Amino acid sequence: MKIDEFQGYLELDRSWQDSFLYPLSFQEYIYALAHDHGLNRTILLENAGYENKYNFLIVKRLIIRMYRQNQFILSTNDFQQNIFFASPQKIYSQVIAEVFSVIVEIPFSLRLLFSLEGKQIRKSHNLRSIHSIFPFLEDQFSHLNYVLDIRIPHPVHLEILVQTLRYWVKDAPSLHLLRFFLYESHNWNSFFSLKKNISFLKKRNQRFFLFLYNSHVCEYESIFFFICNQSSHLQSTFYGSLIERIHFYGKVEHLVKVFTKNFQVILWFFQDPLMHYVRYQGKSILASKATSLLINKWKYYLVNFWQCYFSVWSQPKRIYINQLSKNSLDFTGFLSSVCLNTSVVRSQMLENSFIMDNAINKFDTIVPSIPLIGSLSKAKFCNVLGHPISKPVWTDLSDSEIIDRFGXICRSISHYYSGSSKKTSLYRIKYILRLSCARTLARKHKSTVRSFLKRLGSEFLEEFFTEEEKVLSFLLPRDYSISQRLYRGRIWYLDIFCIHDFANHEWLVMRLSK
């Protein structure tokens, strides 16, 4: 690989990096734009800007103070007494963080527009939608052998993120402003002290930190994809000359004996293994049909790659090798596995008949009942064993509102996990929510669950049905076998746009139960 080609790839679409962004922080309309943008993203990020209020006077005072003082030369003693982060004026911190996140996204937006106009979108960028994950799992996983379950490492030093953005933004004052907020922010430790994945963020300055993390991952993936594409175009060695060479050295040295059955194993090192890369939140997978030896090489290559290119320390235990035929993969809230589905086929030719065993790999997705029950337990819908309990906090609400809340949680979970091939665990989750709702209503009216269910009848259960179940029960009320077969079919619904909540069970239940 030539150095100039590698540098040329890194400089691709960076023609907007010389833009001066810092003067925009002194423009009042940028603050209004950031505030409106935050309100529009409330559904996705649950962050309605800075306290849902746009105060023109606060913005005016902030810009005047930024003109008068140099806030980026700070001593240790002055750090806690800075005007941006003094106790009565913490809103300045949030205002500037919102504005900075809008300003610094400009080079990336211009780069996207430039790519669309010039039609320079690369193939690796075509399928970046979260909804493309599910068809990929269903179509490709049954043909793969190994999966690298990867937890993407985070930078151990704040300067690494600043260095990453320097490729795109060469505006020194903007980078100084970024350093200032990174070292000040109290959210930084909570953002990168991750237990399992990047799914838990504080509401304050959420968009700011989300942009920083995405820019870091984007830079890592751009270099990684380039190296993978270069390795996939390596020419394979012609097997005939390889066999003759091995035989020659075996005869001369008298040290090894080469058998024909070993040739195919050797040739794997000269063939394209057809790697598949999927990332979601702080977790990614690298799937392949390669051998165990080659997948181990990829594992240690990733560790060295992060250390050499990004100065990020990553331990090999953060990358787990999963053999799909033996273990399940926990990804996007599903337990995915590949099982061997055998079927007996009887074939008859003239007077002779043959019985053949036909084995087909089948992709299975299972609803993870234990994590979901644990999340329901933390949200006080059941105990740790999965026994439904009442929700005392909701007893002050009206009956219809209580039923609507329980029904919405049940329908959302059912809607997302409709792509599961085995829905036994899903039925148990529905049972917990239905009985918890009944016990909450019974507690409110000071009656028993049995008498309350008798009074409501089947109308109570219909509130927990999804729209698909209602349609099936209306169209096929008599043919039970057909309706059950249609309901048990695997259907991926692509109208779910907040999938990040569902991929994390605890975050999902806690969010919906508020």
UniProtKB/Swiss-Prot annotation:
Q: Which GO terms describe its molecular function?
A: RNA binding
Localization terms from the record: Plastid, Chloroplast
Key words of the record: Chloroplast, mRNA processing, Plastid, RNA-binding, tRNA processing
- Origin: domain of life: Eukaryota
Q: Name one GO biological process term.
A: RNA splicing
Record-level GO cellular component terms: chloroplast
The protein's matches in Pfam families, at most eight in alphabetical order, are given as: Intron_maturas2 (PF01348), MatK_N (PF01824)
Residues spanning the membrane:
none
Family per UniProt? Belongs to the intron maturase 2 family. MatK subfamily.
Q: What function does the entry list? A: Usually encoded in the trnK tRNA gene intron. Probably assists in splicing its own and other chloroplast group II introns.
Q: Could you tell me which HAMAP family the record lists for this protein?
A: MatK (MF_01390)
User: What protein does this entry describe?
Assistant: Maturase K
